[in-house]
């Protein structure tokens, strides 16, 4: 007798369903992806009371951090693209953390001048392509290229907005992350945590997670370095990666 395939329960379209929330992203140029999930799952948040997500997009990282940290009192998301900001706000309002997450349609440079508070944790999954061939629309160009948010400007804005002992965390392609470290050191930041990421054991590093603290009076702090391998040689997720996402992904 021929067996019938068991269908998974229907999932909502136009976004990504996590265990405790849904992220609609059909109005966002940059969709839910592994980079954002990695940053949201890793960013050190246990001591934070106030959190800022720069370039929040769909609000994915803000929602993940809200789930991870019940002690947090405020999470603000800043987004330059109006449609994405509206969708992030809708995602937050439809979640169980609607009173915690606030989304602002704003330029981060202007926001840094008038922010209502300083932040214990600032996160960003920033654009990293240098301006080159124009994208098909302005919104996608903002999401992908450093034209409207340079790495120098991002570091300067974070420095204005962070608390004295706060952490600033980013996810970037590996080689661009190394360049980002050089820029950060010139601007008075210490790298205190980093995770070098490769897709499988036999592949080179392709992503990097970085956590920075402000440098005072030339002091340097030790950097804790880890490695994350996403897939085994058979293509399945490693136990290590599964442990990172088990609180979020439906089938882990």
Swiss-Prot record:
Locations listed in the record: Cytoplasm
User: Pfam families per the record?
Assistant: MTS
Cleaved signal peptide residues: none
State which Enzyme Commission number(s) the record gives: 2.1.1.223
Keywords in alphabetical order, please: Cytoplasm, Methyltransferase, S-adenosyl-L-methionine, Transferase, tRNA processing
* GO cellular component annotations of the record: cytoplasm
**Its family?**
Belongs to the methyltransferase superfamily. tRNA (adenine-N(6)-)-methyltransferase family.
State the protein's name.
Answer: tRNA1(Val) (adenine(37)-N6)-methyltransferase
